[in-house]
């Protein structure tokens, strides 16, 4: 998954961790 701190392309697919 994507990491929110890395700046994912879609916040909805971004992991809360």
UniProtKB/Swiss-Prot annotation:
Single GO cellular component annotation? extracellular region
A Gene Ontology biological process noted in the UniProt record is:
positive regulation of erythrocyte aggregation
Going by the UniProt record, its keywords in alphabetical order are: Calcium, Hemagglutinin, Immunity, Innate immunity, Lectin, Mannose-binding, Secreted
Tell me the disulfide pairings in this chain: none
Coiled-coil intervals: none
Q: What does this protein do?
A: Calcium-dependent lectin involved in innate immune defense. Binds mannose residues on the surface of the Gram-negative bacterium A.salmonicida. Shows agglutinating activity towards horse erythrocytes.
Listed name of the protein: C-type lectin 35 kDa subunit
User: What organism does the UniProt record list as the source?
Assistant: Petromyzon marinus (Sea lamprey)
């Amino acid at each position: 998954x994507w990491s929110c701190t890395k700046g994912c392309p879609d916040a909805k697919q971004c992991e809360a961790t």
